[in-house]
Amino acid sequence: MAWISRYSMLVVLLGLCLIFSFATLTKQQPNPPDAAEQMLQALRAVTPQRVLVISSNSREDLDFVDALRGKFETLTNKDPSWTVSFVAGTPQDARKAIDGSSSNRLTLVVSPDAQPWKLFEGLAEKFPGKELRFVAPEPVLWPSFLKSQNLINIVNQIVIIAILAIGMTLVILTGGIDLSVGSLIALSAVICTLAIRDWGGGEQADGGTILLCGLLALLVCALAGLVNGLLVVYSELPPFIATLGMMLIASGSAFLLCKGQSIAAVPDSFVWLGRGTWFGLPVAVILMAGMYVATHIVMRSTVYGRAIYAIGGNVEAARLCGIRVRTVIVTTYVLSGLLAGLGGLVMASRLKSGDATYGAMYELYVIAAVVVGGTSLRGGYGSVLGTLVGALIIAVIENGMNLIQIESYMQKVVFGLVILGAVLLDRNARVRR
């Protein structure tokens, strides 16, 4: 039965997905490719005629039009008697297109978001002399939780916490903790955007300048992590106290640098890291996934990874085995600071600005993700993949409760219960081990 304990959090994640799927089951529009196929099948049953595809400018509607355009190209190539045109925009744009049509017989294919337009009520009275046929995708029974865009949003909204949680996992595995990561988010965002504004040309900054300013912010955060590590191993300060002090220093420094004002003088290209997509997926999500894969390999297949587990299990035994305990511990804090800085860059890119208020309370969510993912607060036991599962559990709970309209105050209660439950499970597992 050891596998039950090992994969318990993954089972919890799947269970939560199942619960929220049933809770959000409702009739809704099919995804764009399915809706396009549905429309094509409906039109094949009628006499060839002129077709006008009407849509709004929403993202889902434009995806629907793109999918339908490809299918109509195949259809018109096989049967030239079909004539298809497209209009995207407002009800006024659609009316102009209908009035301007040279054909008296017209089939209107209407996208999901355009269906509620009052333009389509009483078509015969509004367009006398034209024979109009209204065709629209039929709604299907499907959970709002499992819509592809919602699933992407779940992962996308947890990216920053998940990136920080990698470094926090390494620190906690050694028996430490890092409370400064939330403030380092703000410090990183402020330093990067301030450097772009004051030294990099502001809104005219090029890609190379943005990269250098980002590296500067990462360097400062890594140095903050280095100070944390040195205080812990050489001054023998408790990690809680050392990183609490750095949290206050970083937060105060961020406010001093930006003078309490948001810094928004950055170029449009600055948002690529936080909002850009690659092969249909957010760039930040791809970055996060790559980092988790790389860290998992390091922790499972390298001497450094095994040293971290050894230190968390028994510091003295690790030292007697020849492990450079102090060096390893310091590097975990450096990595934690570096990844907190990266999280700050993602947040600044996503919001297209830097602000000293960024990252408030994030350290608690990061620690929660690590603990919920099964990493022991005493060190020596856990994994980064477990941390990813923990971060996803937090994101799924938040997203699911928003979908079923649970108020934010109750969400905090639920998060607190989840954290307490995870710690109790960790305690019981430690007793069994």
Spell out what each predicted region is.
Residues A340, R350-G416:
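Transmembrane alpha-helical segments in multi-pass inner-membrane proteins
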Residues L52-D61, N77-T83, T174-G176, S180-L226:
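Membrane-embedded helix boundary and interhelical linker motif in transport proteins
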Residues P239-T302, V328-T331, R350-G359, I406, ...:
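Transmembrane helix-bundle core of multi-pass membrane transporters
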Residues L10-A23, P112, G167-T169, A217-C221, ...:
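Hydrophobic core segments of alpha-helical transmembrane domains in multi-pass membrane transport
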Residues M1-N31, E37-Q41, K96, E125-G129, ...:
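Cytosolic-side transmembrane-helix boundaries in multi-pass membrane proteins
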Residues M1, I172-I177, A205, V220-A264, ...:
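Short loop segments and helix-boundary regions at transmembrane helix junctions
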Residues I210-C213, A224, G280-G354:
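Helix-loop-helix "hairpin" substructures at the membrane interface of multi-pass membrane proteins
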Residues K147-W199, L230-E236, G374-V384, L417:
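Single transmembrane alpha-helix segments in multi-pass membrane proteins
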